[in-house]
Amino acid sequence: MGLTWLSVGLFIVAHDAMHGAIVAGRPGINKGLGSLALLLFAGFSWRKLIVKHMAHHRHAGTDDDPDFSRGGPLSWYIDFVRTYFGWREFWVLGGSVILYALILGPRWAYVTFWAVPSILASMQLFVFGTWLPHRPDHDAFPDRHNARSTRFGRPLSLLTCFHFGRHHEHHLTPWKPWWRLSRTSQPSGRLSRP
């Protein structure tokens, strides 16, 4: 569980870097740190993710949003994974596993300590950072961001997704890093506890 949470953290670092929130005014440092975090998380491409993530912010919760689906949670998650995990990621991860096995011999450590936590982290990020905040519901969204926030207290908010459940606040202030989202008031767009 701890490794899954740390894997979520790697993605959150990359996400904040996409918004220039790691080192304000230093896009090169943000890109470098974000690229490294994405590579360690699951072999993802910075270029591919930043383009899709900015499209998500421009078109949140609409058919033009690469993170959005009108299906149920399982089909939405499958679409979500297909959007971000392609042949490049497959070859980066596969090559890493082969290289690791050649250097250290066949072991299950890379599965236990990297692959499984990354897969579980993708599910956690999807549930708390995409599905809960952006799913169509009987309550209307508060504004064009088509995002809601969870009402978890700070400890649970940190554990679920590094305060990324404060998703409406994130869409209102994307330049704020994750550690400042917990201190952002929740003006509207609240979600009940799931």
What positions do the PLM features span?
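Long, highly hydrophobic alpha-helical transmembrane signal-anchor segments
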Residues: 1-31, 93-94
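Hydrophobic transmembrane alpha-helical segments that form the core helix bundle
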Residues: 1-5, 60-158, 162
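Hydrophobic alpha-helical membrane-associated segments
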Residues: 5-10, 37, 41, 120
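Structural signature of transmembrane alpha-helix termini at the membrane-water interface
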Residues: 9, 21, 40, 47, ...
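Alpha-helical transmembrane segments of polytopic integral membrane proteins
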Residues: 10-14, 46, 125
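Membrane-proximal soluble regions of multi-pass membrane proteins
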Residues: 24-76, 135-194
